[in-house]
Structures are given as C-alpha cells and as structure tokens.
Amino acid sequence: MDSSELHRRRAYRAQERRRRRLRRRIAAFAGLVVVIAAAAVAVAATGGASSPTTTTSATSHRRAVARHSAHGTAGRSATSGGTGHRTAGGSTAAALGPATGHAGTDSVPILMYHVIAAPPAGAPYPGLYVTPQEFTAQMEALKQAGWTAVTLDQVRAYWADGARLPAGKPVVITFDNGYHSQYAQALPVLRRLGWVADENIQLTGLPPSQGGMTSGQVRALVRAGWELDTQGMSHADLATSDPAELRYQIVTARRLLRREYGVPVNWFCYPSGQYNAAVIAAVRAAGFVGSTTVVPGWASRSGDPYRLPRLRVLGGTSPSALLSQIAGARGDGAPPSTYMTS
C-alpha cells in the first residue's frame, strides 16, 4: 500500500469518527428536546382549564343532504343553506387530563331516545315510543335531581382537555334516527330547560309512520346548541356489510352532514347496536373520535371511546324509574367487543 492510499484511508476514518460524534450530539439534543416537551405538557396539564377547539364553517344554498324517508316516500328536505358552530374533536388521548367541571365526574350516563310520541296501533317496537308527557316529566325530574344535559363533545373536552362543564351532574341525552317528533316534541322541552342533546341522524330510510326531519329542522337543532352525529346513511347492519358498504354508510354520511350543516360530526352511533372490529376500524378511519352502543352502563373516562354504553329509555318509564335506572347502571361492567342486538 503506497503512502497516498494510506493517507486517504486515514482521512476517511477520521471523517467517519467526526460523523459519529455529530450523530451522538444530535441524538443527545433530541433527547433533551423530548424531556423539555414532556415537562411542558405536564405543567400545562396541571394548570387551569383550556378552551376546547371550535370549528365554525358555513354552507349556503346547497342541495339537501338526503330525503329522510322510507324507500324515498316519507319526509322531505329543504335546500336553503345554513351555518353551525360546534366543539371540534381532535385525536383521542390515551391518558386523559384533569377535570375541572363537576367533582368526581369520571363517568357519565348517556340516555337513548327514539320516538317522542304515543305508539300507533300495530307499531312493531312500541317500547321505543315515549310520549311527550312522559318525556317532559322525565326531563323535569332529571333537572330537579341536579342533572344537567351536555353533549358528547363537551364530555370529551372535559375528560381530555380539562374544559369546564355546566354546573350540575352531567348527562348526555341522545336521539336516534332523526324522527320528526324529536324536533317537534323534544326540542321545546329541552329549550325551556336550557338543555342540549345529541342527534344521531340517519340520512334515509325512516319509517313512513313518523317520517324524518327536514334540513331546515335539523338546522334548528344545530342553532339550539344540539350536537349533530350520525347512524350512517340508512341505518344498515354494519356488522354484515362489506368494506365498500361500510365506507358508504360511514364515510359518506359524515362527509355529507359536515358539508351541509357545517358541523364536525365527531361521533358515530352503531345502528341497532351492531358492530365488530371491522366496523370500529372503519369508524375510526373515517375521522370519528368515538361511538355509542346500546350496551347498558355509564360511559367512563377510562373506557374505550368507540364502545360508549348508553341507557335505553322505553315508553312507560316513570320519572322515578328513570332515576333508578341511571343510578343502578353505574356499576355495569365494560361492554364486550361485539354486541349484536336490535
């Protein structure tokens, strides 16, 4: 080996040593940055409440999302535009931050309603009909017992970000499908109490005996502070749907509702409570921050946000029975990975 080759090799080894030292310095600096960032997050988590992120968007003179009807015959939709304002969801935190609302609120009951009307003769599921009188008495009893209605977005912001909740014991009131009676009967009662609710709307296929809300009525709910969520396009059995149908039912429904009403649509409601791992994955991939089931129990801070339990309120439930139902369900266990029921 001549002297020039030896010199080149020594120079190359020296250059490699300098590169290794530089990489070690960069790695050490990156580690320091991570430690500083973690400390900053910890300090922020122990500080005061932070304001939830909000998303405000407008849509004007758009076509109606869909006709809320049975086989295209019942219900109608409006074409005027509107705006909405709602707390937007971000990524779900693995470890949720401190709460600053009602003391000890690590779990919250979520009530489930369907039709607010007397059941017609021959109704296939009469138990899903709660009369306006029953609903009014139930809401007044909740108010008197110290409960306050909040939305799922508010609960999530409280658990994840430390945002404040209204005074009182929080309860989430959900309405499935998008029945006209929810607008006509439930909205006035909740508005009088200063309360809000979550509307899990499906875009097509409602029974002709009730029909669906018009786009204008949906906007009225949004203006009243209701949260707009969805059960998909047509309340299909998602547990038996192929991937293409899942995308249509889940992704398309969220996209159309967001475009039409200018709200985030952060939560999905499994139609008839039917879901499996593939459905959960599709819901998560579509951008939803969580989902509600029909499994009885309270939703908890430590639970799976894509398997939130709910309490079904049936027709004939007295105010005292509802309060007992809520209290008795608090100790229920976590929902199973799949739950098939109607």
Where are these regions (language model features)?
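Terminal targeting segments of Actinobacterial cell-envelope proteins
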Residues: 1-24
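Hydrophobic membrane-insertion alpha-helices, especially the h-region
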Residues: 29-40
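C-terminal region of N-terminal signal peptides and the immediate post-cleavage residues
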Residues: 38-62
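Juxtamembrane proline-rich low-complexity "stalk" or linker regions positioned immediately after a signal peptide
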Residues: 54-85
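C-terminal active-site subregion of NodB/CE4 polysaccharide deacetylases
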Residues: 80, 84-174, 179-183, 216-219, ...
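A short alpha/beta connector and helix-capping loop motif
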Residues: 183-203
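Short beta-strand and adjacent tight-turn residues that come in two discontinuous sequence segments
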Residues: 200, 231, 291-293
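Active-site glycine- and acidic-residue-rich loops that bind
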Residues: 206-211
